[in-house]
Amino acid sequence: MKSLLRLSCLLIALTLLVSMTACGTSDKASNDVSQSSGEQQAASSAEVTPNATPAEKVSLKIFTQQMKENAEKDSRTKAFYDSIDKYTAANPNVTITVDALATEPYNDRAKTLAAANELPEIFEVLGSWNRDFVKSDLVMDLTELINSDSEWKKVIRPTAVNNYTVDGKIYGICLEEGGSTTLLFYNSAILKECGFDQPPKTMTELKDYVKVLKAKGYTPISLGNKGDWVAESCYLSAIGSRYTGNDWNWNIVNRTGAKFTDSEFVKGLSLMQELANLGAFNKDLNSIDYQQQRVPYYNKKAAMFIEGYWAINSLLTDCPADVLAATHVAGIPDCDESKVPNYAAGGNGGWAYALSSKLDGAAKDAAVGWLKTLISKESANTVLEGGNPCAIEPGEYDQSKMAPLQVEFFDLMKAVPFCETYDLIFEPNVIDVMCNGLQDLLINNVTPEKLAEKIQAEYEKTSK
């Protein structure tokens, strides 16, 4: 990955997965809208002042996963479109066009655009893409822009930029915080019917739960891994780290001795396969996606499903009232043999907004001005009041607007130690082999040891 050519080959070939964050988006193919009006921008000492209004007419395009039809149910999306309305109302000579795609088609087009060096002025970038984009000079260095505006810098938490910092320079800013990609959503009524008063606390307990739930005719855990990222992002990132420790993850990134063939990492793969062989999951796990995995849960056919915090928005919107009333959230069960903390994967932001390195003049001023409008206390308040975690320092916000399940989630997050989500830090080609291999692992087409060897072989092909 030393050149754009190598990036091109990788990006076209790979299907990258997501953690965080646009995972509640619609599967609609695209959503092109032009934003040029909205509420007038309010002047407040609590807000960051955007760059000076460009004197000439400027047109910007934002490529994003924020589907406008989701604004009513997803506060991240609402904050995004509110920021466009606010900025264009205050800057009528600036027109912002939004090109929005759902997560998986977004990945595909972003890879193609990056390979052709045709990314628009503003776009979203995944943590694992960042180093390649920097090497290929696709993204603007934002460090000086941040450091030169002390008020703006104050609202940007470390979790907003951790995965987008290369050699001390910042190339992207997340609006949302990672929360957790590894949450256990469970129907307490079904568990009670089967004799359980609480969710499984350990993997040993989970194995017992699986046997009882199956005997009662329930799918223990609904899993949709068609897109191939759920098993990695929502399961293995935490399970693997509970055996290896989080320092191992960074040793992989920095190439300081860790290997995917290490016995502790193989233990995580082995546990995944053991759960599948016990019948913890539905047989069609590789034929349905992350949204479809919720349907058996909504229909009381499945007792549990494991996903990230983004699923809460869909639960609140799509889940039948009686099922929602019985739904609670917990961390995935502890790994009994773990000698390190029982991590939840997440914490840092998964997707960041980045600016094209090609921007200059009035277009650059406008893009920076909009970014400052989005990355603000006002946006943070909107995101938090809608029950989503935020990487930006908020002002005073109304916690009473949160649903009980959202409050339960935030309370849970106060007590868990975080590890990195693999797809946010490991190289894209390594993640691709890992994710494809997990599909095979869960249907017994490969052993844990062989999969570990395949991942390691791909890892060794790449340079630091």
Question: Which sequence ranges carry the predicted segments?
Answer:
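Sec-dependent N-terminal signal peptides of Gram-positive bacterial secreted proteins and lipoproteins
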Residues: 4-26
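Conserved N-terminal structural module of periplasmic/extracytoplasmic solute-binding proteins
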Residues: 9, 23-138, 150-151, 198, ...
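Hinge/lid segment of periplasmic solute-binding proteins
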Residues: 48, 54, 102, 127-183, ...
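Extracytoplasmic/periplasmic substrate-recognition and gating elements
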Residues: 58, 64, 89-90, 194, ...
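Short, solvent-exposed loop/beta-turn-alpha elements that line the ligand-binding surface or hinge
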Residues: 143-156, 242-267, 317-322, 327, ...
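Extracytoplasmic/periplasmic solute-binding protein
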Residues: 166-177, 182, 207-257
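Glycine-centered hinge/linker elements that transmit conformational signals in sensory
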Residues: 210-212, 254-285
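C-terminal capping/gating helix-and-loop segments adjacent to ligand/active sites or protein-protein/ligand interfaces
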Residues: 346-347, 385-397, 407-463
